[in-house]
Each structure stands twice: as structure tokens, then as C-alpha cells.
Amino acid sequence: GQARFVVHGRASHAGGAHEEGRSAIKELAYKIVEIENMTNYETGVTVNVGVVSGGEARNTISPCAEALVDLRYPDPQQGLDARDQFEGIFGDVLSYPIETTEITTDSWINLHRPPKIPTPESDNLLTKTLAIGRLLGLDIGTTDSGGGTDGSLSQAVGLPTLDSLGSSGTGAHSEREQGVVSSLVERAQLSAVLIQRLAAE
């Protein structure tokens, strides 16, 4: 899932009229702590505030601040629960003991990609793939990646789907990300044999 929220405060001079301002950045900071605390590794729910922006000038109490949030969850109900938590955080003023009309938050929440839940059909496809891997002498394992995939959309409508048949690598989405060139041939062989066998069924 994903969310975007924009906090609206009230601009004022950071020196001469500090007390008259309502810092959107300050409120955003409080909300970010609450949002990040939603992460629970035991249940598989992860939340990441990945992009933050705001403010107009160093000497101006910020009238506006924005954050983009990524949400991952293994069970659909967890997504709905997280959405409710987001709405509660967005609806409260956390950084000032004032009426909520002085600081407001606009939010957009989109549970756009369901979790990819195994089915008997996808398990059968996986079993065939692992068997082919063994025949080719490949050490192939399975794991929950926490990744977002179009495969979750196809699987949700009944099409058994496997992910991660491409090259292997490490350090995804970081400056350490790298692919293992030698795995390209191995994975191509695996995919070719799998497609051939499925076509023959």
C-alpha cells in the first residue's frame, strides 16, 4: 500500500512572531514517529516514510509539509487495520495543544496491491520449478520477500504466479545493489525448461 499526507500549518516569522506560527514540519515529525512505530516484524507489517519535504525558508515557520509512505503487509486485514491507524494519526494534532482547525492534514491512502497469498495452484507451480532446479543442479530456495509485485495482482484473480525467476543479487534498493551475472544463464535455463514442460501439459 501507499499513502501521501500533507500537513497544513500557519506561517509566521521564526523570530518576531514564533508563537503565532503552527509548524507543519513539527507536526509532520510527530506523525512520522507514530507511523514508523506501526512496523511490526513479528506480524510482517512494515511501514516506511520514504520521502519528506516541506518549508519555505529558514526563518519562516513552515506552513506546509508532506510525506510519502510505503506500507507492506502479508494479510489483507492488516492493510485495512493500517489504513485505520493512518487515518487516526492524520486526524489528530500531535505537536500542539490547540484546536485541530489550526493544523490540518490532507491524506490519500491506497491499498493498491494485495499481498501475494499462496494457493494450491501456485504451490503446484512452485513444486515443479524447484524440481527442475534440482535437475539442473541449482540451489533454489523460497522466502517471503516483502516486495511489491505485479504478480500479486495476477494471483489475486486466479492466475498462479511465481516471482524472482530473474537474476540473483543482493542489496536491493540501496547503493550496494548488485546482480550476479553468472546467474543469468542458470535462470534462463530454469525458465526455459519450466515453460517447455508447462506447454507440454
Regions found by a protein language model. Give the residues of each.
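Metal-dependent amide/peptide-bond hydrolase catalytic core
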Residues: 1-201
